[in-house]
Amino acid sequence: MRIGVLTSGGDCPGLNAVIRSVVHRAVADHGDEVIGFRDGWKGLLECDYMKLDLDAVGGILARGGTILGSSRVQPSHLRDGVERAKGHVEELGLDAIIPIGGEGTLKAARLMSDNGLPIVGVPKTIDNDIAVTDVTFGFDTAVGVATEALDRLKTTAESHQRVLVVEVMGRHTGWIALHSGMAAGAHAIVVPERPFDIEELTKKVGERFEAGKRFAIVVAAEGAKPRPGSMEFDEGGKDVYGHERFAGIARQLSVELEQRLGKEARPVILGHVQRGGTPTAYDRVLATRFGWHAVEAVHRGEFGQMTALRGTDIVMVPLAEAVETLKTVPAERYEEAECVL
């Protein structure tokens, strides 16, 4: 068989582990040929690819990012995108395509599948917001990076008697904020699923200082918002791909808290460091398993599906289910965190 692989959307620790696993299983065990499209769907649309053999994937298991490159270009962005992709698949004699990506990539994968292309998807996102899989690779690494940063920030916050508002990734869901905040013992967490009341947040932080504490750490997912009308808030706008471009919750919240508390407050934006660098052992293993099972699904002809973790098992689920809803932080999970903040 001849299999095409691509990585699309934001980069994520563990992408190279999937690529490596696909090549090892397909080439070494099944005798397949594997090619990798450069820069995601853009590579397929432009027929820009490289051969992937065992030498090409040597030494990439622990490497962050993706050796194939990535972009946010989707076939649906072009008027003839779907037909162009279908033409290149036929021209290259591909038996299957394995796209690795998050919500946007999986929506494109479903579109391609609905138009007759042989697709087996692999989910990735540090946000952990894909509903049909228990965990996505990259999440564990991102939480670890954010937790270490929070641990380090405590000492500088205490030294200067500051409130630090630490912004972590999470456009629509607060999983990174929730887990890193719990792990680091933050004093407040705000997430997109639960618009915060600025009065309640101010009271919570203020009570720490009244009790003689010298600092406070607030963890904010980038998509967190206040309750309507509770404080002035810039919503931001959209980028060229239609994704929300946030105006900076940490900056706005730190200004508000400083004014209300009379304490020095500073924003800290962790940004892309959360999704860069070497993946954790957990993410390497999960990504490797996803790659292995994606190749097996190709050989079984299970197209229009994607890999997912259920418990300790890797299963295949329809792409249609994968893009229906996001996995958001439920109220009970937030309540668990609240009791220890």
Named regions from a protein language model:
Residues 1-45:
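N-terminal phosphate-binding or glycine-rich loops at protein starts, especially the Walker A/P-loop
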Residues 17-22, 103-117, 177:
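Short Gly/Thr/Asp-enriched flexible loops that form oxyanion-binding sites at enzyme active sites
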Residues 31, 35, 113-145, 191-194:
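Short, acidic/small-residue loops that bind anionic groups at enzyme active sites
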Residues 31-37, 156-163, 214-218, 254, ...:
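Flexible, glycine/charged-enriched surface loops at secondary-structure junctions
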Residues 44-99, 104-105, 137-144, 148-149:
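Glycine-rich oxoanion-binding loops at beta->alpha junctions
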Residues 88, 96-101, 111, 139-157, ...:
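Accessory alpha-helical/coil subdomains and C-terminal extensions
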Residues 252, 305-341:
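Phosphate-binding loop/pocket of nucleotide- and phosphate-handling active sites
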